[in-house]
């Protein structure tokens, strides 16, 4: 079972050490324990936590393998931000900033990631309150946070400084892209979701207001 999981992780994220794999397994265990007390994710997804959330998050490393500064907006239970932070332990110096306004979820992230010595900072604040406080990242991530036009508004201050965004989106992503074009200009690359399903990962760069 563990060997299969390790192989699946390397298939989506590239070469990963056994120590990093063990860190992700430990995070999964903490996630399940905390989920019994606070709502970190939909209960229906817990049986498939490794595939549906951890591997789905880890695949972003393959798209931006050289990035060392990441910013995860609306981190929730830690996907993809916490997974990226654990993977970044192999790539020092690195830092992942996770922004989560829900205090209970932020406490989970702070506690679990500190125990794993992940190179990250958890910001228990609203995204808008972090402008000017978080150094410009190379990559911005967000998963199940908001429609594209809203995400662009939230990410604009960092993207103006040169960051690109990797955004998980579902089957209706084309409608969101079209709706965004009324107010925003941007470069777009579509990446297949290697974990399955009919979603995509959108790579956005050169974001600008029209």
Regions found by a protein language model. Name each.
Residues 80, 157-159, 184:
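Glycine-rich, phosphate-binding/catalytic loops in enzymes
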Residues 1-67, 71, 104-118:
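Class I SAM-dependent transferase core
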Residues 58-142, 152:
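Conserved SAM/SAH cofactor-binding pocket of Class I
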Residues 170-210:
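Active-site capping/gating segments
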Residues 152-164:
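A short glycine-rich, Lys/Arg-flanked "PGG" loop and its adjoining helix->strand segment in the class I
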Residues 95, 119-121, 164, 185-189:
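Conserved beta-strand segments of alpha/beta enzyme cores
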Residues 162-172:
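Conserved beta-strand signature within the Rossmann-like core of class I S-adenosyl-L-methionine
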Residues 76, 144-147, 171-173:
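Short glycine-rich anion-binding loops that position phosphate/pyrophosphate groups of nucleotides
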